[in-house]
Swiss-Prot record:
It is an enzyme of class 1 (oxidoreductase). The gene is HSD3B3. The active site is at residue 159. It comes from Mesocricetus auratus. Catalyzes the conversion of dihydrotestosterone to its inactive form 5alpha-androstanediol, that does not bind androgen receptor/AR. Does not function as an isomerase. This is NADPH-dependent 3-keto-steroid reductase HSD3B3. The lineage of its organism: Eukaryota, Metazoa, Chordata, Craniata, Vertebrata. Pathway: Steroid metabolism.
């Protein structure tokens, strides 16, 4: 493979940081260009350590700033687009989520065409495929089955439309007459050290006498360790630049997971944290059907109040469905086309994540000791 350069959006995020670390190991890579809305001093320090391996350029900017994106794409061979507003709880205004996820992606595709960037890889989500009903079971689904979300929820909707835009852009003519090649990686729940979801879950559990309070005991999901998710992006970048592999990858989407056992969100969090004395809350939980219809009631209240008050319900039907569905996918197509195999085993991923959770437990104990003094 000839020398190449790569722009990673969302570079300060959970996934983006891991992708950058892996890209820095690529021998032919001349530059990693990192784009994020605002890097912390710690982020900058970590990026500076990679300078000994490859050139790392740090850019701060907004994914909705078209001029910023045009500058960021100049002289780049590959764009890996991970920047996104991830929100299934309704905490972020609907239009903001759609703007970041859809309009931002469209701006970036336009920037790639103008800057003659030939490869675009999109970090998509299994949310674009559903689940549409907690009553429908999908086990080891494949790309050929064409599952598609029917929810109007802003996250699922915006990711679905952005993925469609990315795949439709495959074959577009670049400003210099070249061709843009694209693909999308549909990621499930990503876990690992520094996962905000797990960190927040552990924080609530530690404040609740070690009880993990969840509402997803009926779900069965695919999940992926963060390093394995990052590795799939590196392989996609290699593949779309390989004349032999690229024709099979262009315009395709891939489900990405690993060998983490299919289980509920609650069970996964418990498995990762049980060494530190955390345990599931076994108290009574409402039936899923009741939660679903209560979610509908909350949505109705929110709709009726909208002219005078912006009421954000604590949950809705979409969230209830997400947390209580059997919804798993196979990564065989990624194995075939990308040569994807998980870098990190389930056992190693569990151990590393558990050790990190242990550090959170120790921090919590330290905070309690300080408060007691």
């Amino acid at each position: 493979m000839p020398a190449w350069s790569c722009l990673v959006t969302g570079a300060g995020g959970f996934l983006g940081q891991r992708i950058i670390r892996m890209l820095a190991q690529e021998k032919e890579l001349q530059e990693v260009r990192t784009l994020f809305r605002s890097f912390t001093p710690k982020h900058r320090e970590e990026l500076s350590k990679l300078q000994t391996k490859t050139k790392v350029t740090v850019l701060e900017g907004d994914i909705l700033d078209a001029q910023c994106l045009r500058r960021a794409c100049q002289g780049i061979s590959v764009v890996i687009h991970t920047a996104a507003a991830i929100d299934v709880f309704g905490a972020i205004p609907r239009q903001t989520v759609i703007d970041i996820n859809l309009k931002g992606t469209q701006h970036l595709l336009d920037a790639c065409i103008g800057a003659r960037v030939p490869v675009f890889i999109y970090s998509s989500s299994v949310a674009v495929a559903g689940p549409n009903s907690y009553k429908v079971i999908i086990q080891n689904g494949s790309e050929e089955e064409n599952h598609e979300s029917t929810w109007s929820d802003p996250y699922a909707y915006s990711k679905k439309m952005a993925e469609k835009a990315v795949l439709a852009a495959n074959g577009s003519t670049l400003k210099d007459g070249g061709t843009l090649h694209t693909c999308a990686l549909r990621l499930p729940f990503i876990y690992g050290e520094k996962s905000k979801f797990i960190s927040d879950t552990m924080d609530r559990a530690l404040k609740n006498n070690g009880l993990i309070n969840g509402f997803s005991r009926f779900s069965v999901i695919s999940s992926v360790y963060v390093n394995n998710a990052a590795w799939a992006h590196v392989l996609a970048a290699r593949g779309l630049q390989d004349p032999k592999k690229s024709p099979n990858i262009q315009g395709q989407f891939y489900y990405i997971s690993d060998d983490t056992p299919h289980q509920s969100y609650d069970d996964l969090c418990y498995t990762l944290s049980k060494d530190w004395g955390l345990r599931p809350d076994s108290s009574w939980k409402p039936p899923v059907a009741l939660l679903y219809w209560f979610g509908f009631l909350l949505e109705t209240v929110s709709f009726l109040l909208r002219p005078v008050y912006n009421y954000q319900p604590p949950f809705n039907r979409h969230l209830v469905t997400l947390l209580n569905s059997v919804f798993t996918f196979s990564y065989k197509k990624a194995q075939r086309d990308l040569g994807y195999e998980p870098l990190v085993s389930w056992e190693e991923a569990r151990e590393k994540t558990s050790e990190w959770i242990g550090s959170l437990v120790e921090q919590h104990k330290g905070t309690l000791n300080i408060k007691a003094q």
